[in-house]
UniProtKB/Swiss-Prot annotation:
Topology of the protein relative to the lipid bilayer: Multi-pass membrane protein
Entry coiled-coil feature ranges: none
Protein's UniProt name: C-C chemokine receptor type 4
Gene name of the record: CCR4
Database matches in CDD domains: 7tmA_Chemokine_R (cd14984)
Annotated source species: Homo sapiens (Human)
Similarity annotation: Belongs to the G-protein coupled receptor 1 family.
GO MF assignments: C-C chemokine binding; C-C chemokine receptor activity; chemokine receptor activity
Ranges in the topological domain labelled Extracellular: 1-39, 99-111, 176-206, 268-284
GO annotation, cellular component aspect: external side of plasma membrane; plasma membrane
Length: 360
């Protein structure tokens, strides 16, 4: 139900043809405060997530290409998970502006941004699930994993995963539309009139593909991993499991509330739940859990840094390299100025190398 819509009534509409009488019809569920809440809090929160999510996941992509060079199936899955997070990040400026004002970007971007949102959602949880399967094969079926956990199979399964995510997101692309109502432009999913079937199918799709199936697979994988590690203690394996386990737990913790709230919203749309106070709280919950889900985009790089020793080493090397380039550029600028002022300068390359070495 649109927050600004007036509920249907069984009274004859002709009685209320007069404008003032029509406006005086009591609205069963006013939600102006909910929109004001979103206008105030969502744009700054989305901006923070955009900045930190973009920086963190860009660093992960750089590390994977520059240092790890995608040598294994795990590297391929980590790269694709970072790309999934970046899809969310790139959509946030649009949603932030939309929350503060209205949709001004047209129908094309409305469909594209909504589609990016869903593709990022599905692909993200699919790759977290694949990472759990990858750890399961590496630890529980170590011999078989030597043949199965190859770079080639990693690329093939990643392409298949993206295909499934894109296909699952098509309804969001097809049914997202722009419309203007009471001088306010919206970008929302609108189904045909009285079409409850699509609403139910959409909710079931998100909850089954986005929660039930992945959660079942992850629980199976980690129960078998824990069972195996009880008989085989290996410090490196334990650290790898901690990192992947943290990714899984945080993903479920940040996305499960949103899935539950979406399911409850569907029940409201189907008029299974009809209570004004409950609807208002549900709208607040949608904004809160959706923002919580977006925050997840920033967390995976932090997990890699604190739990992955190699990642921590590579990230520090990357920052040292960037710092060295920055210092080098500073010295290049100083050298040009100094050379222009004093043509007989004795500032040599070896001197600059020594200074750069000291800076690093």
């Amino acid at each position: 139900m649109n927050p600004t819509d007036i509920a249907d009534t069984t009274l004859d509409e002709s009685i209320y043809s007069n404008y003032y009488l029509y406006e005086s019809i009591p609205k069963p569920c006013t939600k102006e405060g909910i929109k004001a809440f979103g206008e105030l809090f969502l744009p700054p929160l989305y901006s923070l997530v955009f900045v930190f999510g973009l920086l963190g996941n860009s660093v992960v992509v750089l590390v994977l290409f520059k240092y790890k060079r995608l040598r294994s199936m795990t590297d391929v899955y980590l790269l694709n998970l970072a790309i999934s997070d970046l899809l969310f990040v790139f959509s946030l400026p649009f949603w932030g502006y939309y929350a503060a004002d209205q949709w001004v970007f047209g129908l094309g971007l409305c469909k594209m941004i909504s589609w990016m949102y869903l593709v990022g959602f599905y692909s993200g949880i699919f790759f977290v699930m694949l990472m759990s399967i990858d750890r399961y094969l590496a630890i529980v079926h170590a011999v078989f994993s030597l043949r199965a956990r190859t770079l080639t199979y990693g690329v093939i399964t990643s392409l298949a995963t993206w295909s499934v995510a894109v296909f699952a997101s098509l309804p969001g692309f097809l049914f997202s539309t722009c419309y203007t109502e009471r001088n306010h432009t919206y970008c929302k999913t609108k189904y045909s009139l009285n079409s409850t079937t699509w609403k139910v199918l959409s909710s079931l799709e998100i909850n089954i593909l986005g929660l039930v199936i992945p959660l079942g697979i992850m629980l199976f994988c980690y129960s078998m991993i824990i069972r195996t590690l009880q008989h085989c203690k290996n410090e490196k394996k334990n650290k790898a499991v901690k990192m992947i386990f943290a990714v899984v737990v945080l993903f479920l913790g940040f996305w499960t509330p949103y899935n539950i709230v979406l399911f409850l919203e569907t029940l409201v749309e189907l008029e299974v739940l009809q209570d004004c106070t409950f609807e208002r709280y549900l709208d607040y919950a949608i904004q809160a859990t959706e923002t919580l889900a977006f925050v997840h985009c920033c967390l995976n790089p932090i997990i890699y840094f604190f739990l992955g020793e190699k990642f921590r080493k590579y990230i520090l090397q990357l920052f040292k390299t960037c710092r060295g380039l920055f210092v080098l550029c500073q010295y290049c600028g100083l050298l040009q100025i100094y050379s222009a002022d004093t043509p007989s300068s004795s500032y040599t390359q070896s001197t600059m190398d020594h200074d750069l070495h000291d800076a690093l």
